From Swiss-Prot:
UniProt name for this protein: Threonylcarbamoyl-AMP synthase
Assigned EC number: 2.7.7.87
Keywords in alphabetical order: ATP-binding, Cytoplasm, Nucleotide-binding, Nucleotidyltransferase, Transferase, tRNA processing
Name of encoding gene: tsaC
Role noted for this protein: Required for the formation of a threonylcarbamoyl group on adenosine at position 37 (t(6)A37) in tRNAs that read codons beginning with adenine. Catalyzes the conversion of L-threonine, HCO(3)(-)/CO(2) and ATP to give threonylcarbamoyl-AMP (TC-AMP) as the acyladenylate intermediate, with the release of diphosphate.
Top-level enzyme category: transferase
Domain of life according to the entry: Bacteria
Length: 190
């Protein structure tokens, strides 16, 4: 996609996000659906769309670590833990951090933690940079169906009018690995 078309697609996506709606976009392995993490209305729309219970918690995806800092508590990280995390970011590894009390429950669910990732997908980096904050991100698929890997699959599952940022996935076969930021415990193999 040329830069003008990409810029137009990102601007259109930001308009949708500002309306507290959900968008779809390519990530490292599959298409994701996401929304404004600070909008309870938007997050509830996403959860309803996915038929996902609020208590499961969600993942935030960001252009850089600074975008994630308001949502996580990194004060307990050792230098070695920071080094491990930053050696894997940007990239397809999600880390679960302690969450401060100010992080909304619609993001953390029943947990006192939040899963976050600094993406290396260029389109998502550009989207988060233009939006100025991270996005809630979960796989683009309806309950019981496989995750979408193309724009056409997104439209087939969510409808022709669903707002999609066009682009290619990063080509990975598996969703992101998920690890505990403090202990390194593996929650999901990538």
């Amino acid at each position: 996609m040329n830069n003008n078309l990409q810029g137009d697609a990102i601007a259109a996506a930001i308009d949708v996000l500002n309306e507290e709606r959900v968008i779809a976009y390519p990530t490292e392995a599959v298409f994701g659906v996401g929304c404004d993490p600070d909008s309870e209305t938007a997050v509830m729309r996403l959860l309803e769309l996915k038929q996902r219970p609020v208590d499961k918690g969600l993942i935030l995806i960001a252009a850089n670590y600074e975008q994630l800092k308001p949502y996580i508590d990194d004060t307990m990280l050792t230098d070695a833990q920071r080094e491990t995390i930053f050696s894997r970011w940007p990239g397809p590894v999600t880390f679960v951090f302690p969450a401060p009390a100010t992080t909304p429950r619609w993001l953390t669910g029943r947990f006192d933690s939040l899963a976050v990732r600094v993406t290396d997908h260029p389109l998502v980096v550009a989207l988060c940079q233009a939006y100025g904050k991270p996005l809630v991100s979960t796989s683009a698929n309806l309950s019981g169906l496989p995750p979408c890997r193309t724009v056409d699959e997104v439209r087939a599952q969510f409808g022709a009018a669903f707002p999609v940022v066009p682009g290619e996935t990063g080509g990975r076969l598996n969703p992101s690995e998920i690890r505990d930021a403090l202990t390194g415990e593996l929650f999901r193999q990538g």
